[in-house]
């Protein structure tokens, strides 16, 4: 069914992919991505695992006394950062899988 050495080859490939995925997980954990809103007036930097590292708010926004607008800008910056992190994760995953499309909803074990 697998041919001569086929099963051993398959197991070796699976082990190599597992090692590459572990390395990618380590890289993602170290990665930092910054999202912005309000033309850069609010910036949020997160890790690949979506932990917030830094929030930067332009001082002029603090003088406006418009809490709702500031809250919206913070939420938008966070969402932008998450989107960027997901794009980078997807690109790294494509490197490992050789561009092979994974099923929708497939989650990495991290």
UniProtKB/Swiss-Prot annotation:
It is found in: Cytoplasm, Nucleoid. Pfam families: YbaB_DNA_bd. Gene3D superfamilies: Nucleoid-associated protein YbaB-like domain. Homodimer. Binds to DNA and alters its conformation. May be involved in regulation of gene expression, nucleoid organization and DNA protection. Belongs to the YbaB/EbfC family. This is Nucleoid-associated protein Tola_2216.
């Amino acid at each position: 069914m697998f041919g001569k050495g086929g099963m051993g080859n398959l197991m070796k490939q699976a082990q190599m992919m597992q090692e590459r995925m572990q390395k990618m997980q380590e890289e993602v954990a170290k990665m930092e991505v910054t999202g912005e809103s309000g033309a850069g007036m609010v910036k949020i930097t997160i890790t690949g695992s979506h932990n917030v590292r830094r929030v930067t708010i332009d001082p002029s926004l603090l003088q406006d006394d418009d809490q709702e607008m500031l809250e919206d800008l913070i939420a938008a910056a966070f969402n932008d950062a998450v989107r960027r992190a997901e794009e980078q994760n997807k690109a790294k995953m494509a490197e490992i899988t050789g561009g092979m499309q994974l099923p929708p909803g497939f989650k990495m074990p991290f």
